[in-house]
């Protein structure tokens, strides 16, 4: 689904329960000057024709590969702490966020962070998730799931700012990622949380 930034509420504002079903909300900014020039260059000559890049079978195979990306127990616990911090920020030394967040992230955010972090790790050519993967994708997964208080909205506080604060305050694990430890832990802790829309 797309949302026009000029009409930020969209045609029909979605309630929280429906927004929660979207895995990601990705904000696409205006293109930079060189990017806009490239758009102009491409479209001024002849409209590009779409060509197939991946087959359906390849896409399914990539989805299967992403679901097999290893999530260490420490990384999974880190994901849970990030989500819990949106519900009870006072428990994570952020009492000032208590009046800011009206509704925190649901368990779908936890599942979404695992799924999106796995996909990002795969894009980076890894078969395991790092805390940096979680941090890189956290705002896209969590920001649209947080409902701010009226006072926070009046103060122009954005959900992304809240996520940035949580990422700064909730410490990531210090990992040791050698293959033997991954394989040993992989046998003990397997996270097969699929993201169900």
Q: Model-found features: residue ranges?
A:
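Conserved AAA+ ATPase small/helical "lid" subdomain
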Residues: 50-110
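Residues at helix-coil transition
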Residues: 41, 45, 84-88, 143, ...
